[in-house]
Amino acid sequence: CYDWFEMNTLNMAQQGVFGEVIRAQGAYIHNLSPFWNHYWKNGENDKLGWRLDYNMRHRGDVYATHGLGPVAQALDIHRGDRMKTLVAMDTKSAIGKALVEERADSTCNNFRNGDHTTTLIRTENGKVIEIQHNVMTPQPYNRLYQLTGTKGFANKYPISGYALDAKQLTASGVQPKIDDLNSHSFLPKSEMETLVAKYQHPILKKYGEMAKEVGGHGGMDFIMDCRLVYC
């Protein structure tokens, strides 16, 4: 919720830049292979560590907050809309099962968490949310974060960008400098910077530079605390 892109995009969504947001994506996709050995272990006989053990015992999206939080804000969940229907599907556990067998030196017959889980949620007002979870396969870190609106589009990974329809470009204060600027591609860098400057989130205006100095996930942890102070 507290990444610069997500916060500025939230402000744009709340100001109507994207029109009505009808679909959103979020995820926690983070290959944890370098980290499994560093999670807390319950004594020297614990071969797995708490996180791998938790994934082994629980099915579904076991860490939905990273993906769901930002898009729930953008869709006004519990601020005029609510989640109504959910369906989820996961792959089999191939890597997770192998990790347990490698560490425990025994056969793993029931690793419950699939290597990749996809969840679809439909809201009361007819919006759709897609959330993904994957901590197993070798791929770049990705929270997806994508908003699809009736007048515009925002995307964080793998390339950050915004696209707006022709009328919304002018309405949002963007003055195109090239003739073919349209919703078929992301805004050029200069126009994107203009848009972000206009709709910079108030919390970032007040605490952004301080957050960069303090750090903590690039300043996001600090911004999260600042939101409590700001409220």
List PLM regions with ranges:
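Residues that flank catalytic or metal-binding motifs in active/ligand-binding sites
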Residues: 82, 115-117, 143, 150
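Active-site beta-strand termini and strand-to-loop segments that position acidic
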Residues: 119-125, 149
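Active-site rim elements
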Residues: 54-61, 106-108, 133-134, 208-218
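A short catalytic or substrate-binding loop motif that flags glycine-/basic-rich loops and adjacent residues
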Residues: 65-66, 110-115, 123-124, 138-139
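Short glycine/serine/proline-enriched coil/turn segments at secondary-structure junctions
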Residues: 32-34, 137-140
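Short, mixed charged/polar active-site loops
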Residues: 128-130, 153
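C-terminal helical cap and adjacent loop that interface with cofactors, partners, or active-site loops
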Residues: 72, 140-158, 163-231
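Predominantly a Rossmann-like dinucleotide-binding segment in NAD(P)-dependent oxidoreductases
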Residues: 2-111, 228
